[in-house]
Structures are given as C-alpha cells and as structure tokens.
C-alpha cells in the first residue's frame, strides 16, 4: 500500500515506529506535516497540495494529529476521506473524542463508568457544582488541556471555589470531577486496536504529584488488566468510533472509571512497559481494513 502519515514530528517515536513497521511489511510510506498540507475543495476533483505540489492518491492515511491542531488536522483528514483515502481513524471519530465534554456525555449515555463530573457556565453555580461531585478534594480540568496540562487538584473547598471561579471568569471551559483517592495517583492506559486491547500499562505519578502522565514525570510498568477493565476499554473506543485508541482508566472502589479516550495515543511508553509490538498491530489492522474495503461485493 501507499500510506501517508499525518504528523508534525517525523522524528517522534510513534511516527518512526509506524514508518519502520510499514516499510518492513513492504509498504510505501510518506510522512506529511499536517500544517503544510493545503486543500482545493472542488466539487468533482478535490485535491491536497504539499510544498507546491499536488499529492498523488494514497491507499491509506494514518492521522497523528496533536490536540492543538485538531481543527486544521481533521479538515485535512476530511479532504483525504473526500478523495476516497481510507483513514485509520475517521475525522468524525477524532473530533468526537477530542471534545472532552461531548465524549463524557456519550460515554455516560452508554453506561460507561466515569468519575462524577460537573460542568457549569456561571460562577453563581460553583458551590452547588462542588457539592455535586462530592466536595473537596476535587479535580478541575481545562477542556482544551492535554498531557496533564490544565489539570488542577483542589484539596480544600476554598481552593476549589477560587480555582473554578478564576477559570470561569477568564472564559475557560472546564470540567469539575470527583477525586478518586483509592487510585493513589495511578491510572491504566489500554491500547485498543480493532476492538481488542493489544497492550496495557500502569502509569504512576511521581511523589507529590497526582497526574500520572508520562510527560509530567510519571513512570510506567506492565499490568494485567481485569476482564471488566478490558471490556470497558473496548466499549469506550467503540462508542467514540475509534479503531485505534488509548483509553485511560482509573481503578476505583466501584469499578473501572474512564478518564479519557485518546485518538492518537503515544506508543513509546506502552511498548516499553508492555514489551508488545503495538505499531505492528496497528499496521496489521490497517492492512486488514484495506482488504475489507477492496473486497468485491458477492
């Protein structure tokens, strides 16, 4: 196959691994800087241009779109889809998962376990919002935040009021969530590919920190997940419409709780911790998806 990878970082571990595996399996791969792609949105002949040239057709596209460029990145991916290029994850599914509030509402609607979560517009509702999630300590999350940025643990009622009001008054959209004390600063990242958990790791926050993101100094180790955790991860990815996803789960007294469903999960931490060839599983699935698309109707 001829595969395009949309990535702003060609030297990034995840991008390099996908290129290496795809080439080793005989595919032709080109890494395209998402923000350098530009589009001709014509009725009968839509096209994508890159560095002054019109791109030829690709059999498949792998989107590695960072959260900060979701709007433009999904627009580029839609253009590939308009040109009948098969996407590893669809633009619709990526947009759905990137809207954290919408994602939480969809997961809630389907009965997926979640931390108690509140959302409000007015500072007048802050006291009730704090009560709604069980009081302090609680967690405040910027809807646009990634990699643990914009996530604040408020340990007292007064601190919670101050932080929430400050965010609202500066026109930031936030979620307010209960703090799951029994998780002890750890979460589980499950890598789901084609409806199966192909690898999992436990991420532990460093001492004095509650955010377990590896970008924030957290550590990772292999973990054996329970059947309930496995089913939760698979179902969460399915609800988002993602064929490849990183599902973040907290272990709580009432069972697994989903924190987030990531449409462009990093591979370095989970491959190192689990010893699994996740990039290989992704390319194998891409081949399977292509064969299904090209299979003639009986």
Curated annotation (Swiss-Prot):
**Positions bound to Mg(2+) 2:** 260, 262
Q: Can you supply one Gene Ontology CC term for this chain's record?
A: cytoplasm
Residues annotated as binding Mn(2+) 2 are 260, 262
Q: What is its EC number?
A: 6.3.2.-
Looking at the record, the residues that make up the ATP-grasp domain are 104-287
Q: What InterPro entries does UniProt report for this protein, alphabetically?
A: ATP-grasp (IPR011761), ATP-grasp_RimK-type (IPR013651), ATP_grasp_subdomain_1 (IPR013815), RimK (IPR023533), Rimk_N (IPR041107), Rp_bS6_RimK/Lys_biosynth_LsyX (IPR004666)
Key word Phosphoprotein present in the record? no
Cofactor(s) required, per the database record: Mg(2+); Mn(2+)
Kindly indicate whether the keyword Metal-binding belongs to this entry.
yes
Residue positions binding Mg(2+) 1: 248, 260
Q: Name one Pfam family in it.
A: Rimk_N
Q: Report residues binding ATP.
A: 141, 178-179, 187, 211-213
* Family, per entry: Belongs to the RimK family.
Q: This protein is called what?
A: Probable alpha-L-glutamate ligase
- This chain's source organism reads Aeromonas salmonicida (strain A449)
What gene is behind this protein? rimK
